[in-house]
Swiss-Prot record:
Record's function text: Required for rescue of stalled ribosomes mediated by trans-translation. Binds to transfer-messenger RNA (tmRNA), required for stable association of tmRNA with ribosomes. tmRNA and SmpB together mimic tRNA shape, replacing the anticodon stem-loop with SmpB. tmRNA is encoded by the ssrA gene; the 2 termini fold to resemble tRNA(Ala) and it encodes a 'tag peptide', a short internal open reading frame. During trans-translation Ala-aminoacylated tmRNA acts like a tRNA, entering the A-site of stalled ribosomes, displacing the stalled mRNA.
Record localization: Cytoplasm
Keywords: Cytoplasm, RNA-binding
InterPro entries per record: SmpB, SsrA-bd_prot, SsrA-bd_prot_CS
Cytoplasm among keywords: yes
Pfam families assigned to the protein according to its UniProt record, in alphabetical order: SmpB
The gene coding this protein: smpB
The organism of origin for this protein: Parvibaculum lavamentivorans (strain DS-1 / DSM 13023 / NCIMB 13966)
Full protein name: SsrA-binding protein
HAMAP family: SmpB
GO CC annotation: cytosol
Primary location: cytoplasm
Amino acid sequence: MSSKSGGAKKKAGDGRKIIADNRKARFNYSIGETFEAGIELKGSEVKSLRTGQGSLNEAYAQVTRTGEVMLVNAYIPIYLQANQFNHETRRPRKLLLHKREIEKLAAAVQRQGMTVVPLRMYFTDKGRVKVEIGLAQGKKLADKRETLKERSWERDKARLMREKG
């Protein structure tokens, strides 16, 4: 009957427990196609993520020459109870994708100059950690300003509706 405090942040509508959400990526990039990838983690990393900590800020994914996709610069804090068996906080982690998906990502990055960015990290119903990655094109400064204007207008519109209604 007791619930654990400090766990994963929130539960999405489809039963996912979201660990980390990269909100800056949606602002700085226009996201095209998205993929769901598994991630190769050590035990202490999974334990640390279960506490709801972790960050995808400044993280990116890259396709290596050997045909693997690596998640670089994602922050998973150390797990205090793991003491000597702990992990590095910002080590490169392998993302698990199908071969066709990897080829598609590599082609888009090479030919179209796109970037692969992690959008969110979450636990599935089965307790597996997944990372949602997206093919992204960098936004220009004018596009970012337009996004800010739209958000501001939506906020003002909602405020006006509350005052009138």
